[in-house]
Amino acid sequence: MLDAFSRVVEQADKKGAYLSNDEINALQAIVADSNKRLDVVNRLTSNASSIVANAYRALVAERPQVFNPGGPCFHHRNQAACIRDLGFILRYVTYSVLAGDTSVMDDRCLNGLRETYQALGTPGDAVASGIKKMKEAALKIANDPNGITKGDCSQLMSELASYFDRAAAAVA
């Protein structure tokens, strides 16, 4: 996993150059933005259980055929695995928000996940729907202006949304 700082240093080192003013300014912007990132991660972490549980309940209501007798996720172990996987994905989304980078999510969570679901007979589009439900809840929680660092968070919210979109696309 390379964070933004490591990437900039690595790129400068490959060129055998000092950091440019543009690179330093970009890193200063990241530092200024870090409190907002920490606020978002803290909120998502504090609300992780409800985000996952509510997404799962909404998914069951939306796609009962997947969870009813005869469905691919009928058995309680499969249902527990669904909840667990949604939680894993949310956790890796928070890592991505903190790092400003998807490499850890890609490497440790998403790579091979679609194939795993296919092998288990789990409909990837159902998992993607659950991820989208988590995205909606996470954005609502993260966008609440009370008790967080002031300032424009639109770019960060767009970034947060993109991490959920990436996860949903990886399993669909």
Swiss-Prot record:
Sites where the protein binds (2R,3E)-phycocyanobilin: C82, C153
Biological process annotations from GO: photosynthesis
Cellular compartments per GO CC: phycobilisome; plasma membrane-derived thylakoid membrane
Superkingdom of origin: Bacteria
Any Pfam family the entry gives: Phycobilisome
Record membrane topology: Peripheral membrane protein
Post-translational modifications reported in the UniProt record: Contains two covalently linked bilin chromophores.
Localization of this protein: Cellular thylakoid membrane
InterPro entries, alphabetized: Globin-like_sf (IPR009050), Phycobilisome_asu/bsu (IPR012128), Phycobilisome_asu/bsu_sf (IPR038719)
Keyword field: Antenna complex, Bile pigment, Chromophore, Electron transport, Membrane, Photosynthesis, Phycobilisome, Thylakoid, Transport
Signal peptide: none
Protein family: Belongs to the phycobiliprotein family.
Job of this protein: Light-harvesting photosynthetic bile pigment-protein from the phycobiliprotein complex.
Assembly notes: Heterodimer of an alpha and a beta chain.
Protein name: Phycoerythrocyanin beta chain
